[in-house]
A protein has these predicted regions:
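N-terminal amphipathic/hydrophobic targeting modules at extreme N-termini
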Residues: 1-11
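N-terminal beta-alpha lobe that positions the nucleotide/phosphoryl donor
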Residues: 15-170
Length: 170
């Protein structure tokens, strides 16, 4: 039965991934290579982006197609929303996988993808905004009955911190 469940799970994952005709990977290096290999196993064409310095990188060679998005400096390439979105539009990608770092925690990027009709493979912009701020994240967790460690929320005075420290210990 375990083998059956594994096959069923893999078929389900394949069907979910088939929702995408082409995935742009908004990253470089090992994470981009891993995403490209996973997409290849699922039969999904991939688009790599790269800076001028990364033109000969493995992820560029492995992808179905690749686009240079700017100079070596990350701020002018891998962190450039206009450059990444241009590559997505030109390539016809219908989804963008951010990998980690760079665009993976940029709520504004996820929102732009959504507005352009491109699926952001990751959390929604709203979820990123809520979880990006510790106070809001904690409040959201408490409101949804998720256990959290003892904490104070936002404190305004030294006295509040001292009172909490005496009450909870440290």
């Amino acid at each position: 039965m375990n083998g059956f469940l594994t096959v069923h799970f893999l078929l389900l994952i394949r069907d979910i991934w088939k929702m995408f005709r082409k995935v742009l990977i908004a990253n470089r290096g090992e994470i981009a290579v891993r995403i490209i290999r996973a997409c290849r196993e699922l039969g999904i064409p991939t688009v790599a982006i790269y800076s001028q310095a990364d033109a000969n990188s493995l992820h560029v060679r492995l992808a179905t197609e690749a686009y240079c998005i700017g100079p070596a400096k990350s701020a002018d390439s891998y962190l450039s929303i206009p450059a990444i979105m241009s590559a997505a539009m030109v390539s016809g990608a219908d989804a963008i996988h951010p990998g980690y770092g760079f665009m993976s925690e940029r709520a504004d990027f996820a929102e732009i993808c959504e507005k352009q009709g491109i699926k952001f493979i990751g959390p929604t912009a709203e979820a990123m905004r809520k979880m990006g701020d510790k106070a809001t994240a904690r409040k959201t967790m408490i409101e949804n009955d998720v256990p959290v460690t003892p904490g104070t929320g936002i404190v305004k005075t030294v006295e509040e911190v001292q009172e909490f420290a005496h009450r909870v210990g440290y």
